[in-house]
Amino acid sequence: MAIELDLQLAVEDQNGLPSAQDFQTWLDKTIPPFQPQAEVTIRIVDSQESHQLNHDYRGKDKPTNVLSFPFEAPPGMEMDLLGDLVICRQVVEQEAIEQDKPLMAHWAHMVVHGSLHLLGYDHIEDDEAEEMESLETEIMQGMGFTDPYLAEKE
């Protein structure tokens, strides 16, 4: 076992979504350098569920692209469960259009970004953001995608 994926599709229309293999590949290219074995749940949701979760857990009154919920094992308990990613289909699709990015590249970026959050990376402080964005770019380019922050740098 390397990275075990539990994929939950909580959207009515599943046409056009990345495949389970796509999600698995993106996890496999992101997590093992930091943690060789892990279990990750990816839940694809609609904007209503994303909005509710974003409100409940972050105090933000809107849907968001990806939410990361790291698993915190009780003291003394060893588990490979890394955590959950909740990705909002509508937000990802809208952002890809607005940012003029290929849709699959943006899906991959959300998995990479969320996975790094599960691994403890953050982007609250400038130096943290720089480190995290650099890792995201390196991972994305390693999978054949362009720098996800290219438009912001130009």
Curated annotation (Swiss-Prot):
Pfam families: YbeY
Enzymatic class: hydrolase
GO molecular function: metalloendopeptidase activity; RNA endonuclease activity; zinc ion binding
Sorted UniProt keywords: Cytoplasm, Endonuclease, Hydrolase, Metal-binding, Nuclease, Ribosome biogenesis, rRNA processing, Zinc
GO biological process: rRNA processing
Residue intervals passing through the bilayer: none
InterPro entries: MetalPrtase_cat_dom_sf_prd (IPR023091), YbeY (IPR002036), YbeY_CS (IPR020549)
HAMAP family (alphabetical): Endoribonucl_YbeY
Function noted in UniProt: Single strand-specific metallo-endoribonuclease involved in late-stage 70S ribosome quality control and in maturation of the 3' terminus of the 16S rRNA.
Homology family: Belongs to the endoribonuclease YbeY family.
Family annotation (NCBIfam families): rRNA maturation RNase YbeY
Protein name: Endoribonuclease YbeY
